[in-house]
Design a protein with these regions (language model features):
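Conserved non-cysteine loop/helix-boundary elements of the Radical SAM core domain that shape
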Residues: 1-2, 10-170
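A C-terminal junction/extension of Radical SAM enzymes
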Residues: 156-202
């Protein structure tokens, strides 16, 4: 508890990541209330979401408890690549509809590139579906095969990953998207989502 006259400590951001923290939405509100009573959060509150959990009801609850940024782990909008990653086929219509009804400062969507038989055209399609359906920020990370997991997925060579990343970068910049980091692009130059900062963050 803050004592009388004691100022709140200023931090840049508060992020809830890993897994599916939104499944504990009621407790999440309690945690945010407690933390904001001790800290002055200057650049917003973010949370990671699984696409199958994104509904209008959930987004409204997140907005009501003070969340300003969401990051949705899409990986791909295409079933053939979701299957490679061990994900079930996703029906994204509910998510798209919810994003049209509840607004956030940042709506980020995460993707994986350099999957078997994945082409630049596949990634181009994912990028445009994202930006056309509520996202104003995307992150595109290379697939990394951690040997101990025995995924059986044939990984791209480094030079192939670099070439694909260059195509992605050129495509995004040609369309006026702002490159925020090696893996991330924003639609309007202002949206951002990064759980790692150089400033104080929680």
């Amino acid at each position: 508890m803050l004592t009388e006259g004691q100022a709140k400590k200023e931090v840049s951001s508060l992020y809830f990541g890993g897994g599916t923290p939104a499944l504990a939405i009621d407790r999440l509100g309690e945690v945010i209330e407690l933390l904001t009573s001790h800290f002055e959060i200057t650049q917003g509150i973010g949370i990671e979401l699984h696409p199958s959990n994104v509904t209008e009801k959930l987004l409204q609850k997140l907005s009501d408890i003070g969340v300003t940024k969401i990051s949705i782990g899409i990986q791909s909008f295409q079933d053939k690549f979701l299957g490679i990653l061990g994900r079930k086929e996703n029906r994204f219509e509910t998510m798209f509809d919810a994003l049209q009804k509840v607004s956030f400062e940042t709506v980020a969507m995460d993707f994986i590139f350099a999957l078997p038989n994945q082409t630049f055209q596949d990634l181009q399609k994912d990028i445009e579906v994202a930006f056309s359906n509520g996202a104003n920020h995307i992150a595109i990370y290379p697939f990394i095969d951690f040997g101990f997991l025995e995924s059986g997925i044939q990984e791209f060579q480094k030079k192939e990953k670099r070439a694909l990343l260059k195509q992605i970068t050129d495509y995004c910049e040609e369309r006026g998207y702002t490159r925020d980091s090696i893996w991330t692009f924003s639609k309007d130059g202002r949206a951002s989502y990064s759980s790692m900062t150089r400033d104080n963050f929680l």
